[in-house]
């Protein structure tokens, strides 16, 4: 069981990383809430991990905190929610927001996540309610909100060319597709979130937040 990984960040794409650990490259899938906290390529990265073994694949999922890892592990225990859907949930909302949804039985907000309908949202609340409330102190102890990396801060000061804007848009759409959104919805979400954004991470963050607010 691989429970933690520390190494050099070789590649980073929304939802998937390549980390060099003593010459061995590990592909690690991450929620966007973890992706936002990453440093630049060639920087050191440390993640808590959960290893999933299936008949057709072995996949490693990484999280910025032990709490997020625990929440993920509880989510995938819910009938009808696999690892991909759990990652989509933790991409659209942090652990605190998820806890609020569970406490308030906000089925409509949970149903904004791709792959989750009303029935699945209701089942999620029933099955995870007590477990998540027991973790409330750990969840609230985490720093609220997402972290803006120095790379994002520097990029926000730079002008965006048409070519760069197209690249950011396409990368954002690909990330939203990977999270389970349909092509038409992904393009609409990315387009509405573009504004003066200068990184794909910024667009994706705004798109996911916008999706939650519009249906919350």
From Swiss-Prot:
Keyword DNA damage: yes
Protein name, per record: Holliday junction branch migration complex subunit RuvA
UniProt KW keywords: Cytoplasm, DNA damage, DNA recombination, DNA repair, DNA-binding
Superkingdom, taxonomy of origin: Bacteria
Keyword Oxidoreductase listed: no
UniProt cross-references to InterPro entries, sorted A to Z: DNA_helicase_Holl-junc_RuvA_I (IPR013849), Hlx-hairpin-Hlx_DNA-bd_motif (IPR003583), NA-bd_OB-fold (IPR012340), RuvA (IPR000085), RuvA_2-like (IPR010994), RuvA_C (IPR011114), RuvA_C_sf (IPR036267)
Function comment: The RuvA-RuvB-RuvC complex processes Holliday junction (HJ) DNA during genetic recombination and DNA repair, while the RuvA-RuvB complex plays an important role in the rescue of blocked DNA replication forks via replication fork reversal (RFR). RuvA specifically binds to HJ cruciform DNA, conferring on it an open structure. The RuvB hexamer acts as an ATP-dependent pump, pulling dsDNA into and through the RuvAB complex. HJ branch migration allows RuvC to scan DNA until it finds its consensus sequence, where it cleaves and resolves the cruciform DNA.
Main location: cytoplasm
Domain notes: Has three domains with a flexible linker between the domains II and III and assumes an 'L' shape. Domain III is highly mobile and contacts RuvB.
BP GO terms, sorted: DNA recombination; DNA repair
Chain spans, region Domain III: 164-216
CDD domains the UniProt entry points to: UBA_RuvA_C
Region feature Flexible linker, mapped onto this chain: 144-163
Residue segments, region Domain I: 1-64
Subunit structure: Homotetramer. Forms an RuvA(8)-RuvB(12)-Holliday junction (HJ) complex. HJ DNA is sandwiched between 2 RuvA tetramers; dsDNA enters through RuvA and exits via RuvB. An RuvB hexamer assembles on each DNA strand where it exits the tetramer. Each RuvB hexamer is contacted by two RuvA subunits (via domain III) on 2 adjacent RuvB subunits; this complex drives branch migration. In the full resolvosome a probable DNA-RuvA(4)-RuvB(12)-RuvC(2) complex forms which resolves the HJ.
NCBIfam families hit by this protein: ruvA
Subcellular location: Cytoplasm
GO molecular function, one term: four-way junction helicase activity
GO cellular component, one term: cytoplasm
Region of interest: Domain II: 65-143
S-S pairs: none
Similarity-based family: Belongs to the RuvA family.
């Amino acid at each position: 069981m691989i429970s933690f990984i520390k190494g050099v960040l070789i590649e980073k794409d929304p939802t998937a990383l390549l980390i060099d650990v003593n010459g061995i490259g590990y592909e690690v899938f991450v929620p966007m809430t973890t992706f936002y906290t990453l440093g630049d390529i060639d920087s050191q990265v440390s993640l808590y991990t959960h290893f999933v073994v299936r008949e057709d694949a072995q996949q490693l999922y990484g999280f910025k905190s032990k709490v997020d890892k625990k929440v993920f592990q509880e989510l995938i225990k819910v009938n009808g929610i696999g690892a991909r859907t759990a990652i989509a949930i933790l991409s659209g909302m942090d652990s605190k927001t998820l806890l609020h949804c569970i406490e308030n039985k906000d089925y409509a907000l949970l149903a904004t996540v791709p792959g989750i309908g009303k029935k699945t949202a209701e089942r999620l609340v029933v099955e995870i309610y007590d477990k998540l409330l027991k973790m409330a102190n750990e969840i609230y102890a985490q720093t609220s909100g997402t972290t803006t990396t120095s790379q994002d801060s520097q990029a926000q000061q730079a002008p965006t060319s048409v070519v760069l804007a197209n690249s950011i848009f396409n990368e954002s759409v690909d990330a939203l597709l990977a999270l389970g959104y349909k092509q038409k919805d992904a393009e609409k979400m990315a387009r509405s979130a573009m504004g003066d954004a200068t990184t794909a991470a910024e667009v994706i963050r705004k798109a996911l937040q916008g999706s939650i607010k519009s249906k919350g």
